[in-house]
């Protein structure tokens, strides 16, 4: 409830942070992707903050307008515009994968809220049309798409090939903790983008990757159950947005590691190394737990324990 009054300010603040991040890199002539904002000894990825802010804003907005979401101009168009603006500022960092995920999460929330299918499909295909030149005229993005359909293991397809090789090395039961060969300068970014491959190599399918995916499915279905029990529409949309976000990121990361998706650079939630991403995901889990205990604490305030959730 404390998030509702500041939802719009959080979204506006996130857009400002994205602008500051890009401006900082341009002013200082830094050629690397403008994804991190540095404050002394600390740094954080501003798109992570934007992702959470958008979920909170959409939950607030959908709660406020309710059935008007079926109207185009005073219902559906404002949140789609907010999603588009946020995606645009993330794309120019450049971080197309995160922008795509932000858009997908937003569209799914609009679908859950009861928006017209025609409006949703129109927005989705419009996004695809805009995305094509963004991908095609970016050499490294187009190389990732091209290598997915025609992999060159010595060039653009090297990462994907090594990730699949790592998974195959693990087999059913893995090579043992710490025994991965791929993480020793063979597979790029094994601690972030391809952590799922290393888990598969060291712990195997039965002890590593399958249990991990089941944990994320548990979080997803638990989040849906929390949303169904919640009596506040804001809490319902917030819980749904959070569990959709977590499970989408998890399964896209796993799909990249197994060769089902092109390389995206998206981390595995709660697993991949990274301060700001880990912090934001923990905040999301905390909000989900808060929504879960709210109804119980009201109905049974004398016996409620902070250790009991759901």
Describe each region flagged by the PLM.
Residues 10, 50-57, 211-218, 238, ...:
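Residue-level signal for the membrane-embedded core of alpha-helical transmembrane segments
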Residues 139, 213, 220-235, 300-309:
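Membrane-proximal intracellular helices of multi-pass ion channels
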Residues 55, 59-62, 139-142, 217-220, ...:
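Alpha-helical transmembrane segments of polytopic integral membrane proteins
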Residues 62, 103-119, 181-207, 266-279:
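Interfacial segments of multi-pass membrane proteins
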Residues 1-93, 254-269, 273, 277-278, ...:
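Membrane-helix boundary/helix-loop-helix interface segments in multi-pass membrane proteins
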Residues 226-265, 271:
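Loop-to-helix entry and N-terminal half of a specific, functionally important transmembrane alpha helix
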Residues 8-15, 73-91, 96-136:
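Hydrophobic alpha-helical segments of polytopic membrane proteins
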Residues 30-36, 119-211, 230-235:
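Hydrophobic, glycine- and aromatic-enriched re-entrant/interface helices and adjoining loop segments
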């Amino acid at each position: 409830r404390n998030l509702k009054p500041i939802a719009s300010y959080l979204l506006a603040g996130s857009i400002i942070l994205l602008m500051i991040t890009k401006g900082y890199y341009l002013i200082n002539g830094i050629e690397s992707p403008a994804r991190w904002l540095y404050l002394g000894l600390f740094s954080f990825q501003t798109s992570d903050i934007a992702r959470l802010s958008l979920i909170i804003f959409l939950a607030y907005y959908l709660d406020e307008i309710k059935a008007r979401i079926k109207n185009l101009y005073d219902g559906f168009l404002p949140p789609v515009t907010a999603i588009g603006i946020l995606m645009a500022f993330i794309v120019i960092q450049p971080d197309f994968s995160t922008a795509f995920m932000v858009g997908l999460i937003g569209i799914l929330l609009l679908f859950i809220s009861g928006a017209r299918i025609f409006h949703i499909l129109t927005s989705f295909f419009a996004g695809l049309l805009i995305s094509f030149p963004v991908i095609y005229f970016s050499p490294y993005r187009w190389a990732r798409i091209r290598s997915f359909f025609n992999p060159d293991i010595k060039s653009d397809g090297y990462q994907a090939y090594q990730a699949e090789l790592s998974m195959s090395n693990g087999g059913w039961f893995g090579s043992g903790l710490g025994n991965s060969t791929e993480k020793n300068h063979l597979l790029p970014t094994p601690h972030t983008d391809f952590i799922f491959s290393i888990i598969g190599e060291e712990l195997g399918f039965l002890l590593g990757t399958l249990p991990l995916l089941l944990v994320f499915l548990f979080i997803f279905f638990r989040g849906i159950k929390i949303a169904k029990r919640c009596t506040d529409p804001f809490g319902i949309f917030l819980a749904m947005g959070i569990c959709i976000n977590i499970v989408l990121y998890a399964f896209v990361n796993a799909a990249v590691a197994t060769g089902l998706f092109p390389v995206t650079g998206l981390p595995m939630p709660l697993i991949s190394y990274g301060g700001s991403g880990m912090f934001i995901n923990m905040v999301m889990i905390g909000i989900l737990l808060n929504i879960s205990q709210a109804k119980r604490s009201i109905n049974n305030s004398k016996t409620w324990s902070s250790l009991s959730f759901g």
